[in-house]
Amino acid sequence: MFDLVIKRANLADGKGEVDIACQSGKIVEIAKSVLGESKEIIEAEGCLLSPPFIDPHFHMDATLSLGTPRLNVSGTLLEGISLWGELKPLQSIDDIIARAMKYCDLAVAKGIGAIRSHVDTCDDELKGVQALLEVREKVKDYLDLQLVAFPQDGVIRDSTALRNTKRALDMGVDVVGGIPHFERTMSEGASSIKLLCEIAAERGLMVDMHCDESDDPMSRHIETLAFETKRLGLEGRVSGSHLTSMHSMDNYYVSKLIPLMVESKINVIPNPLINIMLQGRHDTYPKRRGQTRVRELRDAGLTVGFGSDCVMDPWYSLGKADMLDVAFMALHVGQLSSREDMEWCFDAVTKNSAKIIALEEYGIEKGKPANFVLLQAKDKIEAIRLRAHRLLVVRNGRIISRSNPIEHTLYKPEGKTVFNELS
């Protein structure tokens, strides 16, 4: 007897409806019709069954802190960093844990199966590190949480950041992070990349660097990151997050830069909701969109995955843990409007991001863990168009979130009409 069978589900490959049988936490059969009894049967009725959404870039130590101690009035990255500096001394480890656990509940209900969260390493108490290591343990049965040691104030600029970043890694943080564009000078930014990549190489860790989150076309730290990746043999293990300055760079320089990134197999993590909000703040009109060159980077063969970055924190007042909101924004800002492009945007919040964070055994295939989300949509494009309702979230063959389909009832002169938004 199976533990769970999903009947008549459409998979992301668009090849038609199938049944999926789960037993002992694994997918044991995928067929047009699965025969045999099951403890529970779910009728998908042609809805899309997707692998879990993956968020490759988030700040869980800051999430849901909106308004403490004040709001970001200018809406800029730099005021957000300043505001975060005011907030850090006011929060306790328990505060961070409580907010993070609430966010994890939101994320799971929205079908997120894994989050890579940066955690600030510039306070001697390492409050965020202590808190999120505890959260990682608490949520491990239903959410994969990968942590990045992130020296928010600059690993060189802040006198204790290097020591504390190493302490965080010793405590069990997974990935080496950095922020070269926030160092005092371009040369110190380059030095910080060299230093942090060497630490990652020595420890056998991945790197995820906030890089060139600026409108300044001369912010070119991604070039140094690509060089150090190649020099240290870190190909495929390094991600450049944001890369917003590429939006403003000279096309000739970009034509030289992208092949260097390809040679180093750099992963790319734009954060569309935040990039479109924070960038271009010094512009009048025309006003820059700020999102990096997604199409060109993808077409060059680089792995591109979209992150959500922030939800209700010093940098962003909105958000609801919805990776389809992220894909929806990326599609518009990047003018990714062909059917192939729109379907790829769905991949950028699922399988591409899973590859970036090196998530093992991901996908809906026989023998893999039974991790998936059932969406109230027929295919990937409709899922993005509707930011589709999550009907079911399954982790290791166990239903961990369930909700009823959304329907609308209209009362018209000729009578009552019940419908949903599916095409």
Regions found by a protein language model. Give the residues of each.
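C-terminal cap of metal-dependent C-N hydrolases
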Residues: 355, 366-422
